[in-house]
Design a protein with these regions (language model features):
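Active-site gating loops and adjacent loop-to-helix segments of metal-dependent hydrolytic enzymes
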Residues: 60, 81-92, 132-160, 202-214, ...
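His/Asp/Glu-enriched, well-ordered alpha-helical/loop segment
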Residues: 231-240, 258-343
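Active-site core of metal-dependent hydrolases
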Residues: 157-276
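A conserved glycine-rich beta-strand in the N-terminal activation segment of trypsin-fold
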Residues: 17-25
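Divalent metal-dependent hydrolysis catalytic cores, especially in the metallo-beta-lactamase
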Residues: 60-64, 77-106, 119-132, 159-173, ...
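Conserved, mostly hydrophobic/aromatic
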Residues: 126, 181, 211, 309, ...
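Alpha-helical scaffold segments that flank or form the walls of functional sites
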Residues: 48-51, 57, 67-120, 143-158, ...
Length: 343
């Protein structure tokens, strides 16, 4: 049995902030948490802050490789390293609107990564192609379409156990299709949508629990047309991700959203990698990425996201940590195993 002890000046459990705590870890599992009896500042395994590992449910690649362009396990291994260095022990690798062949290749890549013993990857997030072309953002219109039930069945059967999240526009997909996806154990996230306030609210009331990158590629909040954003703000339970880099969303807008949504707002990096290959060439412009002249992804890590939330938005550290761990775990129904520290 491998046993070690960690002392924390501050322990963020996901629910509370505790001071001067001792954690006993046996075989990679926390077995004890108790107040420290000793002065811990000089202890070898003493840390200023101990918090739940972060979770990024929308990230496309790292180190000059996008999964959609290089759909192999060799692309996911360095992505795990990138996420880990930014504090995220787990992630959902993402592929944007593309061909069916690329989706299948990405499914195979995740499967192979698991077979090779790869860590951290929870599965695949398929963003599109069943989205609204008027809110396509950087997605390529040539692949965007309304799906048939047979197309959905074929993709989900091929990706069984691999596909964990699908972002779609609820006004583009029938309720039959949405319910079929959900019945397959896949999280449906609403995004790249031009739905009206009432259409979006109806979709949330009918069971869509999550939306993708607040403010980006969705009908905006206006005083006579509250749109998709207004529906998210007003709904009592729907959660939504946000990209806190100051480019995807102004920091003051994040502050407004946080006041409206509270624990329903969580962080994704939406991070991509620089590449000139494939239909989505990404070029680093300052500290963000553009594809074909359109904002297409961030250069964030989850750790830099926390720093932005605290320094730029004014969110307390304890709450910022929840937004990168506890809340995304809840959004993908993983709260029992991720997003908190407990015995």
């Amino acid at each position: 049995m491998h046993k070690k002890t960690i002392l924390a000046k501050q322990l963020f459990t996901g629910n509370n902030c505790l001071h001067n705590q001792t954690l006993v870890i046996e075989d990679n599992r926390i077995t004890e948490i108790f107040p420290s009896d000793e002065l811990i500042t000089n202890h070898t395994n003493c840390y200023d802050i101990v918090a739940p590992a972060f979770l990024d449910i929308q990230i496309y690649g790292a180190h000059d490789k996008l999964l959609a362009v290089y759909p192999t396990a060799d692309t996911i291994f360095p992505l795990y390293d990138y996420c880990s260095k930014g504090g995220a022990s787990h992630f959902v690798v993402t592929v944007a609107t593309n061909s069916n062949a690329v989706f299948r290749a990405c499914i195979d890549a995740v499967k192979d990564y698991w077979h090779q013993g790869g860590k951290g990857c929870l599965g695949l997030h398929v963003e599109g192609p069943w989205i609204n072309s008027s809110k396509k953002g950087a997605h390529l219109e040539q692949f965007i379409h309304e799906p048939s039930i047979n197309e959905v069945i074929d993709l989900l059967e091929y990706g069984k156990g691999i596909i964990k999240i699908i972002t779609l526009a609820p006004e583009v997909c029938s309720q039959e299709i949405i319910q079929y996806i959900q019945s397959s154990g896949i999280i449906v996230s609403a995004g790249h949508s031009n739905a009206t306030y009432h259409e979006a609210t109806e979709a949330f009331d009918n069971g869509i629990e999550t939306a993708t990158h607040l403010f980006n590629a969705m009908s905006p909040l206006q005083h006579r047309a509250p749109g998709f954003v207004g529906a998210i703000f007003n709904h009592p339970t729907v959660m939504c991700s946000i990209v806190p880099d100051g480019y995807h969303v102004d920091f003051e807008a994040i502050k407004i959203a946080k006041k409206q949504m509270g624990d329903r707002l969580f962080v994704i990096t939406d991070a991509v990698a620089e590449t000139t290959v494939g239909p989505y060439p990404h070029h680093l412009v300052g500290d963000r990425y553009e594809s074909n002249g359109i904002l297409s992804g961030s250069a964030l890590t989850m750790l830099s996201s926390v720093k932005n939330l605290v320094d730029k938005v004014g969110i307390p550290l304890e709450e910022a940590l929840r937004m990168v761990s506890t809340y995304p775990a809840k959004a993908i129904h993983r709260s029992k195993s991720l997003g908190s520290i407990a015995i």
